[in-house]
């Protein structure tokens, strides 16, 4: 028996539809207790602040978020007894707002993108004496994935070699943490990032459309270890949403926009590895990440067509 819901962190690795002669496998992170991959860094950042003496009973937490980190922090705050205030850009799905409030968090909506939310969180930190965990630069964010998600992948693949990790980038914590752990075991593993085609700053473009929810913040996060990255793939939001619908209707996997984008890129990498012969086992094994459930995107129209 777990002592509380936070001990339930963890997710399955599931083989999904893959190009012929390849294996694409996804970490289905909606199986975490708060429903996304961001539950892991939310817990790690809070516990790191507690251990450092920066967060004590009675303190309030403030954090800018596009949704999932905020939900994770709201859940952790509910368990540990912290008041949580979340600052979110307008235009993000109504489901995310409702889930945060359901956990008891206060929510402030700002005009603009995640940069505007960061500015407002800075103001609240200074004005109200709240503790900001700063997910974009907090080392506990990638460490959460290095110490939990990465080892889970290694256990779940068994004796197979991971040939590539393909994952979308927001804070960069997921790609950095899992990537560092996998590369320790598989030095030749390919690590590829995925970003929106309309907001492709990793590809050298100017910040653009913030339509993707949870991927492509419009700047390079300090938590993203760019030296790990072998290649960056861009995906159009319409293609990502079409893949979300396919995954739901053909494979029973209800996932969000960044997951659809990552899956498209992962299948492309798997096919390329098969064609080039650059893989270790009988066929290429490509791991990707499904961050959250498509339930958080219903009002966004992702599944309407």
PLM region spans:
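PLP-dependent amino-acid enzyme catalytic core
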Residues: 1-305
């Amino acid at each position: 028996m777990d002592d509380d819901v936070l001990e339930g962190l963890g997710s399955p690795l599931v083989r999904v539809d893959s190009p012929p002669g390849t294996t694409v496998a996804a970490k289905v992170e909606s199986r975490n207790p708060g429903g996304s991959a961001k539950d892991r860094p939310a817990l790690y950042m809070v516990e790191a602040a507690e251990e450092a003496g920066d967060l004590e009973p009675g303190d309030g937490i403030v954090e800018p978020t596009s949704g999932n980190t905020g939900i994770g922090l709201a859940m952790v705050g509910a368990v540990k007894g912290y008041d949580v205030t979340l600052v979110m850009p307008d235009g993000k799905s109504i489901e995310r707002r409702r889930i945060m409030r359901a956990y008891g968090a206060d929510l402030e909506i700002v005009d603009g993108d995640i940069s505007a939310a960061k500015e407002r969180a800075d103001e609240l930190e200074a004005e109200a004496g709240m503790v900001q965990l700063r997910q974009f630069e907090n080392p506990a964010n990638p460490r959460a994935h290095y110490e939990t998600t990465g080892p889970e992948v290694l256990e779940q693949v068994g004796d197979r070699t991971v040939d590539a990790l393909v994952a979308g980038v927001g804070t960069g914590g997921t790609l950095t943490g899992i990537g560092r752990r996998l590369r320790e075991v598989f030095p030749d593993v390919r690590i590829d990032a995925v970003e929106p085609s309309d907001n492709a700053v990793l590809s050298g473009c100017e910040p653009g459309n913030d339509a993707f929810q949870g991927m492509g913040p419009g700047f390079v996060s300090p938590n993203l270890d760019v030296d790990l990255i072998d290649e960056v793939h861009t995906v159009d939001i319409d293609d990502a949403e079409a893949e979300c619908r396919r995954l739901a209707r053909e494979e029973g996997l209800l996932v969000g926009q960044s997951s659809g984008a990552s899956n498209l890129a992962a299948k492309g990498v798997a096919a390329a590895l098969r064609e080039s012969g650059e893989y270790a086992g009988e066929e290429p094994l490509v791991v990707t990440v499904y961050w959250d459930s498509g339930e958080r995107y219903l009002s966004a129209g992702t599944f309407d067509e």
